[in-house]
């Protein structure tokens, strides 16, 4: 059985929609409802035992945006506002997982290189700011083609890409 782990970082219903669809298609799904940066570090530094990892979050040119915490709380965690590609390089330890990062700007070359260098089988993310609906539709179509229809990663990506009319999701290998 294919295993998917979702890191949900304040994205509303995206993670719920992906989880329900994935479970319907026979994927074993676990979710971390991220409240602080240590949870991301713990998950992605521990050689996760899953075939697919979905980082369901928000991003910008700085990197993955973290949940806003009060100063007295955020000082207890390794990263505050954002986790950059340089930060990810310090703790990632992946287990040949397919990593999909739905956060805006997650598909910049420097971020992709870090994930690949640290053990991702491949890395998929948008290179700019996709519309939220397009992002969700890409995720659902990719999972459907990859898991349910047994397409290889390249073919599943090619079939899912038109769901985002601006075709911002990029596959890095």
Q: Over which residues does each language-model region extend?
A:
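Flexible, glycine-rich phosphate/dinucleotide-binding loops
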Residues: 13, 61-62, 132
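A domain-level signal for caspase-like cysteine endopeptidase catalytic cores
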Residues: 1-52, 102, 114
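Short, low-complexity, polar/charged sequence segments that are solvent-exposed and flexible
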Residues: 23-27, 50-53, 72-75, 118-122, ...
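Short, glycine/charged-enriched secondary-structure capping and boundary segments
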Residues: 19-22, 66-70, 114-117, 138-140
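Glycine-rich loops and low-complexity Gly/Arg-rich segments
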Residues: 31, 55-58, 78-80, 123-128, ...
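Hydrophobic, Leu/Ile/Phe/Ala-enriched alpha-helical segments that form helix-helix packing faces
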Residues: 21-26, 44, 92, 146, ...
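Catalytic-core segments of thiol-dependent peptidases
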Residues: 32-105, 109
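Active-site-proximal C-terminal subdomain of hydrolase catalytic domains
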Residues: 98-173
């Amino acid at each position: 059985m294919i295993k998917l782990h979702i890191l949900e970082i304040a994205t509303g219903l995206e993670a719920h929609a992906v989880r329900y669809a994935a479970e319907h298609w026979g994927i074993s799904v676990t979710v971390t409802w991220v409240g602080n940066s240590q949870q991301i570090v713990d998950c992605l530094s521990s050689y996760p035992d899953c075939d697919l990892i979905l980082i369901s979050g928000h991003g910008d040119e700085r990197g993955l945006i973290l949940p806003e915490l009060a100063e007295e709380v955020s000082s207890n965690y390794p990263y505050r506002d954002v986790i950059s590609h340089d930060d990810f390089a310090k703790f990632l330890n992946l287990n040949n997982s397919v990593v999909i990062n739905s956060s805006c700007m997650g598909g910049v070359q420097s971020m992709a290189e870090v994930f690949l260098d640290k053990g991702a089988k491949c890395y998929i993310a948008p290179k700019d700011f996709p519309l939220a609906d397009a992002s969700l539709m890409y995720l659902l179509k990719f999972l459907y083609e990859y898991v349910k229809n047994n397409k290889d990663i390249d073919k599943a990506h090619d079939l899912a890409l038109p769901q985002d009319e601006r075709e911002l999701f990029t596959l890095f290998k």
